[in-house]
């Protein structure tokens, strides 16, 4: 099921892959630019801006007033380590939460199970493998706190 809020603009080229028992909720006054792909249960808040070609997997929650740069990936898929014959074992989806007012820079990747705190900034090109506290700037591969921001 697809639920779209008031005054929300979604480019025609955005792809939604929703199953029979999944819901994508997009809040009011949100913009999603072309080329994005959104799969499974996803909640996107109010006043969110998602730039072009973002890839979002199931079990993602994006808070209000979040900005997401182009080519960002929110990847909830992860695998158990399997036996020698096939190391990528059973798949699961660990949720990602993006806190209100945060900003994820271009070409960043956020991996399964991560929480990005409210008001945090993820610098462009970062790979986020661990939780990010509120009101910090993280950067790098893997992303690390480089600056505390004023609240």
Where are these regions (language model features)?
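Flexible, glycine/small-residue-enriched loop-and-beta-strand segment within the central core
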Residues: 2, 9-112, 141-142, 149-150
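Beta-rich strand-turn-strand
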Residues: 58, 106-120, 126-130
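Short alpha-helix at the nucleotide-sugar/activated-sugar donor binding site of glycosyltransferases
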Residues: 67, 120-121
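Conserved G/P- and acidic residue-centered "switch" motifs that form tight phosphate/ATP-binding loops
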Residues: 122, 140
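A short, acidic, flexible beta-alpha connecting loop/helix-capping segment that sits on the rim
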Residues: 126, 142-144
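Glycine-centered loop/turn positions within well-structured domains
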Residues: 134-136, 144
